[in-house]
Structure formats: C-alpha cells, structure tokens
Amino acid sequence: MEIFGTQQNLVTKIYRGDVNSISIMLPKNVVALGNSVDIVVRPISGACWKTSYDFTADGIVSKNASAMTKVGTDSNTMKYSITNNAVSFTYQNGESTNATNDSLIAVIYHRNFSEV
C-alpha cells in the first residue's frame, strides 16, 4: 500500500492467463463514490492496454463493454466490462474472434479519503 496525500493506492493481486477467460471481482469495500480503479493488461510482449474507472456509487457497479487504451504495437482490440463488480475482458483479432494470449493483469485500487 502506498499513500500519496489523500489517496491510498493498492495492488492486491497480479492475474495471469487467457484474458478472455479471467473474471476479477472488485471488493465491495473499495467500490465507493470517490474511489477509482486502474486496470492494466499485458497480453503480448510489447503492448499494454489500460483503463481507469471512477466509481459513481457505493457497493455494486456495472459498466457496458468499453474499449481500453493501447500502449505499444498490437493489431488486436481489448475491451472490458463490469457486471455486479465482476470485471471481464474481450481480446479479439480483426476477424472478431478471441486472440491467443498469456496476459498479465494488474488491478490498482485508489481509495480517497479526507485529511483529518
């Protein structure tokens, strides 16, 4: 855990495997108005995909499939979605079929709090 000003930053676990078959549960105690999460996926050497999500409610969150931002060279596409706090991914090639990968996934939680 790192604390910078009024923000606690925490990486809880690094996940590895086929990103198309991994689901990550966001803890309810972190899903709170004002908190946020960064998700970083490295499906192949030389490319990373990243997204940030600001929680707009307490407890349970859902989000329709959205594109992630690419850094590096990768001809495939990456999307993420959240359903009842479960984050899932879709990594596909140009033919809209799941692309082969052995991904590393990091979820970084940002918990905001007021100084006392």
List PLM regions with ranges.
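Beta-strand-rich, repetitive solenoid scaffolds
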Residues: 4-5, 52, 81
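Surface-exposed ligand/attachment interfaces on beta-rich extracellular proteins
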Residues: 11-34, 44-49
